[in-house]
Design a protein with these regions (language model features):
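Membrane-interfacial loop-to-helix junctions in multi-pass transporters
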Residues: 21-25, 62-67, 101-102, 118-125, ...
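Short, small-residue-biased leader/transition segments that mark boundaries at the very start
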Residues: 1-3
Length: 321
């Protein structure tokens, strides 16, 4: 990136950056605005609440657009098949299969060793939050299970302050599956439009993805919006090419959203182990349960913690005897 490109990151006016759709200047302004809000402390609380409310409204508008997205996907797929032949469907099918294999490899080769290093039984953890994983497969939204995942991690014996800090932070910044999605789809779209990306272009695209993917919402359809914004900011891949994957985006999101949820659960448990904020007796007791159906009621969590302690004590006494 030359000096002129770096200087262009600073918008001449915030309104102009938003009006012209310059993603990187908007992102720069947003980051600086966030730092300023952090610096003023409690005085900026009303502004933070207002920005949060506006973001919820905007994402609801995106949700409305996603209701008619199948029509656009149908048109895009019809155009693709009509112009390039049925072989384009085979390419999309290969993308879906490859991506599912990639997500499975990530869980086995990355998340599993991390969980094992912190003495977390991955198969039991997957079974424990299996209902939440199935929900996000159907809804394609990690936000839909946030309350239940929060409650289940507390029921596992993780101290509430750790859950309250790590889990929301992970929802905002730890998008393992989404990063896999961005990388895979970006390379696929580049090949689909006949572009051979150089190493410098790939690294530049990766840098922009690292910036634009952070702070994203866990609502259905937000990933493809971020992808389109990233391609517009990079200028290397035509934004119109995103229409090629609209027909299979739902299948792809059914793979990467559960990876996001599982990654945040593993991260919360790992940090709890590191900080000594995990009740081991409760943790082992909950993972041994044949079924895990935890409500969001804090009193239910406290009852299950006490139950775990009382069930564990006789076992320890028997061992000592």
């Amino acid at each position: 990136m030359c000096i002129r490109d770096r200087v262009s990151l600073v918008p001449t006016s915030a309104v102009g950056a938003f009006a012209e759709g310059d993603v990187l200047p908007v992102l720069f302004f947003s980051v600086m605005f966030g730092f300023a809000l952090l610096a003023v402390g409690s005085k900026g609380r009303a502004v933070v609440d207002g920005v949060h409310a506006v973001s919820q409204v905007l994402f609801k508008m995106v949700a409305f657009a996603m209701y008619v997205a199948p029509i656009g996907a149908f048109g895009a797929m019809a155009f693709t098949v009509g112009r390039f032949g049925a072989s384009s469907l085979l390419a999309l099918g290969n993308l879906v299969v490859m991506f599912y294999v990639l997500c499975a490899l990530f869980v086995v080769a990355v998340l599993w060793p991390i969980a094992r290093a912190f003495r977390v039984d991955m198969p039991r953890l997957i079974r424990y939050i299996g209902a939440e994983l199935m929900i996000v497969v159907g809804t394609n939204s990690s936000e839909s299970v946030f309350p239940r995942l929060h409650a289940k991690l507390r029921a596992l014996g993780v101290d509430p302050p750790i859950v309250a800090l790590v889990l929301p932070t992970g929802y905002a910044f730890n998008h393992d599956g989404t990063c896999l999605y961005f990388a895979s789809v970006a390379v696929f779209l580049a090949q689909a439009v006949g572009l051979n990306l150089t190493i410098a272009q790939q690294l530049g695209l990766l840098a922009i993805l690292l910036a634009t993917s952070k702070g994203g919402a866990g609502v259905a359809g937000s990933a493809i919006v971020v992808l389109a914004s990233t391609l517009a900011a990079s200028g290397t891949i035509p934004v119109a090419s995103v229409a090629l994957i609209l027909g299979v985006h739902r299948l792809l999101s059914s793979a990467f959203v559960p990876v996001n949820v599982l990654g945040n659960a593993v991260a919360t448990l790992a940090i709890a182990r590191m900080e000594g904020a995990l009740n081991v007796a409760t943790f082992e007791h909950e993972l041994r349960r044949p079924r895990a159906d935890v409500s969001d009621d804090p009193s239910d969590i406290d009852d299950r913690r006490r139950e775990a302690v009382f069930e564990r004590r006789p076992h320890r006494d028997d061992v000592r005897a």
